[in-house]
């Protein structure tokens, strides 16, 4: 048995919950062979306007629907993720706003929500190769909510183009409630991907279907036209964030 826990001990060791056995370890968080499958599509401008918060501005009526396979990550392990990222501008700088994410692993859900403010929910995303097709799917429970396909490795993509897009800032709306349910933290968080090593990048013909669901509303941003598709692998570090805008500041 150790000594009794003092107030100073709580302040010194507090990081995540449970206090003595946190749901995720401290970073840095390095990802190896992180696999992306991204379909960029055109959607309704009116739908985007109801979702993207000020002071962000919608750059174009586009959405990037992303599937990400993470077989080897420090602290977070082996998992798959999917979600929607919206191209935006913040003070004249172009970046991406992460609107919603769905994944299958507790540690990155807890860490993502608590540290950065990622809008993560538990679901069953999947990436796999079926014969000559790259397939991405999202099930929420037993219900199919998203289905994406792409011709497998048809054409190489210029690495500089992909690296430039990965260097852009990313934005998230972090919300942590007070004990009475009112917002205690409400911030626009900015983060970057660091130390990126791009291993391969491909494109091909693609299709995307989004289907209505009450609690997994990816179809709220409907697909009007598929613009492009991208499939690539990289090693990278998920950098910690900074506060770009504080909604609670007077």
UniProtKB/Swiss-Prot annotation:
EC assignment: 4.1.1.4
Superkingdom to which the source organism belongs: Bacteria
Gene3D superfamilies assigned to the protein according to its UniProt record, in alphabetical order: Acetoacetate decarboxylase-like (2.40.400.10)
Keyword Lyase recorded: yes
Keyword Ribonucleoprotein: no
InterPro entries: Acetoacetate_decarboxylase, Acetoacetate_decarboxylase_bac, ADC_dom_sf
Active site, per annotation: 120
Keyword terms of this UniProt record: Decarboxylase, Lyase, Schiff base
Segments crossing the lipid bilayer: none
Catalytic activity: acetoacetate + H(+) = acetone + CO2
UniProt-listed NCBIfam families: PRK02265.1 (NF002614)
Protein's job: Catalyzes the conversion of acetoacetate to acetone and carbon dioxide.
Family of the protein in this entry: Belongs to the ADC family.
Protein known as: Acetoacetate decarboxylase 1
